[in-house]
Structures are given as C-alpha cells and as structure tokens.
Amino acid sequence: MTDNKNLGGSTLLPAYFGEFGGQFVAESLLPALDQLEKAFVDATNHPEFRQELAAYLRDYLGRPTPLTECSNLPLPGQGRGYARIFLKREDLVHGGAHKTNQVIGQALLAKRMGKTRIIAETGAGQHGTATALACSLLGLECVVYMGAKDVARQQPNVYRMQLHGAKVIPVESGSGTLKDAVNEALRDWTATFHESHYLLGTAAGPHPFPTIVREFHKVISEEAKAQMLERTGKMPDVVVACVGGGSNAIGMFADFIDEEGVELVGAEPAGEGLDSGKHGATITNGQIGILHGTRSFLMRSSDGQVEESYSISAGLDYPGVGPQHAHLHSTGRATYVGITDAEALIAFQYLARYEGIIAALESSHALAYALKRAKLAEEEGKQITILVSLSGRGDKDVDHIRRTLEEKPELILKEEER
C-alpha cells in the first residue's frame, strides 16, 4: 500500500489533518476514491442535493433532535447550581443512533454516482442497521460485514438488518470484531467498486471518508450550538462524546472547534483498565501508524502488529481512530480520556433510573465522564455546563448489560444510590 500523496496524485480537498490522514491503499482503489471525492464536492455544491438531503433529515430521520437537560440525576452540587448536564438526543434519530445522519448522505451520494450496491461494516450493528434501512428506502442492494463475535452479542440488530433486506456476512477471521469486518468490506470494494459504494461507518479510513463523514454528521453540533444558546444564552463549557472510530464525536465537535472557550473531550473505552491489556483507548494508550488506509493513532505492538482492542461496547471496539481526532489531540484542541466498563455501566444505570432514558453503552462512556466533571465542579466550587452527545439508544445492549450485571453484582446500583 502506498499513499496517493507520495504517488504524485492530487486531491480536491485536503487529504491530511496535520500529519494524520492520507490514502494508504492499493493503487487499484485510488480511482474509486478520486471518483467519490469529486462526486461529494459536486453534490454538496449542488442546491438540489442539499435540499433533498435536508428533506430526508427532517422528514425521515426526525431532525432536529431535542436537547434534554438532566433534571433528576443526583449530581454532586446540583442543588447549589454547580453542574448542568445537557444531552443531545441522537438516540431519537430514526434507526436509534447518530449513524443514520451520514448514512443517508452517503447513500444519496452513491445513488447520484450510479452505484447499485452498498457495502458496509458494522460493530454494534447500529451502522449496519442505518445502512440497511437507507438502502431499503432508496432501492439499493445492501451487504453488511460484521465480526462473528459482534453477531453473537448483537442479535437484535442482525435481525433488524435482515428485515430491511440486507445480507449480513459474519466475519470469522482475526478477532471476529469490527476491525476484521472493515478488512473484509475493503476487500469486497476493491473487487467490485465499479458497481459498489463502500459506505464507511466511521470518521476513519482513507481520504475522503473522514471529511465526508464529518460533513454529514456536522448537523449534530450545528443544532446543539443553536439549542444551547437558546436554552442557556451561552456556549457550553465542555462538550463530550464517546470515541471509538470517532464519527459521533467529530460530528459533535465540528461546529465547536473554532470556539476556543469550549473544552472538547473524547471518552475512549478503557475496558478493564488502561493497564489491563483489555481496552480500546487508542489515543490515550496508542501509537501512530497506518490502519485501514489512514495514518492515525492505533493499538499496535512494538513490532508493528495491530493489537486487538476490547470494550464492553461493540461500537467502541476498534483499534484505530479517525485522523482528525488524532490531529485535535496532537494540537491540544481536544482531550481524550479513558472510561472503564464499570464506569459506563454505572452511568447507564443512573440515566435509566433517574431520567428514564436507556442509553447505548457507547454513549454511557460520555455520560460517565460528565458525571466525573460534575463531581469535580462541586469539589472546586465552580459552575459548569456540560453538553453530552447521547449518540444512541441502548435497546441493543439491555440483554448484554443484564447478563454482565448478573455476573458482576457489585456493579449494580445500591439501594441508597437509587
């Protein structure tokens, strides 16, 4: 694999975020990437495409999504006005998560390009579900690659994809998780790109995917900024989102990046602990390298081999991260922190018990960080407003969480915490 930049090629849009990004792919895929970039630039400059996309976001996805303030959480110092936590409710998007935002955009783009077949990868099944429903809506063939382990732990989403007419292909190779599903999807696309579009589900991969995914997800932060100004009269102090590959986070960060007074925080999966060897905290504990066509942080061994990631949340179980997140980290514009499985499970239970919201395990990582910051605000005697990307709903996780809590009863909320 070589980088298009080093082949003397050129791109219409910047292919790098600082030192991160690029097109580290087989030369046979470069024409497909060039075609995709040109189609994206043409489409987003075309009023009819923008109007069609806006109509689907409004009438099919249900945008704008609401902003909900947590009013019942037993926050430290809440009665003294230290912390206010607001949730951007991407769990209410049709399909159950933020994923559908950019899936509709890419599917419309693929149809505009004359593609008849959509290839996708999925971890938790949310991206696969979003892709399947978009293909059903737009009359496109849909093939979804999913790690065999993820198929086993996300059966409801597998069935949902099949109900929408998608062919779900379990991937047994490697660790049988998201990384391996991406590998198989890329192999498929390499062989079939003349009729197929690879609908990448995260803000990673070779250029122009990180830019395309960000631009189609930017609606999250555009809405949230306007809603926060309307509700509070000011910007949030902290914006937090979970980070696996980084799609919901880059959508949530995008419109706040130039707001210097807003702190951006990505909550990575620390799994069983950053020193346990079982985590997916790519930026917090990773190294710079190349994975799935892009230069970014990844989990790899001293001899350069990609290591297996781990998270209780299938959607965060990925050993890489989008290149713009790597750049935001390296420049200090955003901070990335590890949240353990246990912390996410506690946050999940708090939100369900006190606010009546079943959040995805992915989103629960972001909420767990918000709860930590609320406690810190009380200790410091400072007021703080925290905006959380509630990236998806947790229906898919309920059985998994029930089994986990049965195995680890010490993580069940105590009566006094209820």
Curated annotation (Swiss-Prot):
Coiled-coil residue spans: none
Gene3D superfamilies reported for this sequence: 3.40.50.1100
EC number: 4.2.1.20
GO molecular function, one term: tryptophan synthase activity
Keyword set includes Cytoplasm: no
CDD domains with a match to the protein in the record: Trp-synth_B (cd06446)
Self-association state and partner proteins as the record states: Tetramer of two alpha and two beta chains.
Pathway given in the UniProt record: Amino-acid biosynthesis; L-tryptophan biosynthesis; L-tryptophan from chorismate: step 5/5
UniProt organism field: Corynebacterium efficiens (strain DSM 44549 / YS-314 / AJ 12310 / JCM 11189 / NBRC 100395)
Keyword entries, A-Z: Amino-acid biosynthesis, Aromatic amino acid biosynthesis, Lyase, Pyridoxal phosphate, Tryptophan biosynthesis
InterPro entries in the cross-refs: Trp_synth_b_CS, Trp_synth_beta, Trp_synth_beta/beta-like, TrpB-like_PALP, TrpB-like_PALP_sf
Family that this chain belongs to: Belongs to the TrpB family.
Protein name stated in the entry: Tryptophan synthase beta chain 1
Chain positions with N6-(pyridoxal phosphate)lysine modification: 99
Function: The beta subunit is responsible for the synthesis of L-tryptophan from indole and L-serine.
Gene: trpB1
Taxonomy, superkingdom: Bacteria
Cellular component GO terms, alphabetical: cytoplasm
HAMAP family, alphabetized: Trp_synth_beta (MF_00133)
Cofactor(s) needed by this chain: pyridoxal 5'-phosphate
Enzymatic reactions: (1S,2R)-1-C-(indol-3-yl)glycerol 3-phosphate + L-serine = D-glyceraldehyde 3-phosphate + L-tryptophan + H2O
Alphabetized PROSITE patterns for the sequence: TRP_SYNTHASE_BETA
